[in-house]
Design a protein with these regions (language model features):
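Alpha/beta-hydrolase fold nucleophile elbow
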Residues: 14-25
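Glycine-rich nucleophile elbow surrounding the catalytic serine of serine-hydrolase chemistry
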Residues: 23-33
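Short beta-strand/loop motif that positions the catalytic acidic residue
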Residues: 154-156
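Alpha/beta-hydrolase-fold enzymes
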Residues: 31-117
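Alpha/beta-hydrolase active-site loop
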Residues: 1-11
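Acidic catalytic loop of the alpha/beta-hydrolase fold
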Residues: 119-120, 159-166
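Active-site nucleophile elbow and catalytic-triad environment of alpha/beta-hydrolase enzymes
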Residues: 123-144
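Short, proline-enriched alpha-helix->beta-strand connector loops that line the catalytic pocket
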Residues: 146-152
């Protein structure tokens, strides 16, 4: 619904212009959830770096909810970070570089790692929201497709660990 509010604001300020949406990674989940209900609002959609369906999402949700019984939902958890955030680094352990999975160019990853705006971890609520988006994205429930001619571009790397590819 947040994306729909943004859509309404943008269309009010820029009436008559085509409206495209781009979602990357977690944002790709959000735009696909948006698409279920508001496909008529869009003139085009670009979906990039799409996380694949994760059959462990219900178990992850249960773990996060269990952790929230003892911690504030807006607090961080090393356990949750080690399970969720670090799972993409595991195939790249030999490179001895955190976030090596984001790019094959080591210098790009080093620059990313030094940027304080890039080095954050989710709160428990953030992980729960991510898992909710994943479940909603891959659920067959709730689709009200009305814009059958909507152009949609999906872009992902063949070895993207988010998509389930092997590095």
């Amino acid at each position: 619904e947040d994306l729909h509010q943004i859509t309404r604001i943008i269309k009010k300020h820029y009436p008559g212009l085509p409206y495209f949406m781009l979602g990357h990674s977690m944002g790709s989940l959000a735009v696909r959830c948006y698409l279920k209900k508001y496909d008529r609002e869009l003139d085009g959609l670009i979906v990039c770096g799409c996380p694949g369906k994760n059959t462990m999402a219900p178990l992850g949700t249960a773990l996060i909810r269990m952790l929230q019984t003892t911690k504030d939902p807006h607090s961080k958890s090393r356990l949750a970070d080690s399970i969720f955030a670090n799972m993409f680094d595991r195939p790249f352990r030999a490179e001895n570089l955190i976030h090596a999975w984001i790019c094959s160019d080591r210098k790009v990853v080093e620059t990313y790692n030094k940027d304080p705006l890039c080095n954050f971890t989710f709160t428990l609520n953030g992980y729960e929201s991510l898992l909710w988006l994943m479940r909603q994205t891959y659920s067959r429930m709730g689709w009200r497709v009305r814009n059958h001619k909507l152009p949609v571009l999906f872009v992902s790397g063949a070895s993207d660990p988010c998509l389930g590819g092997s590095a």
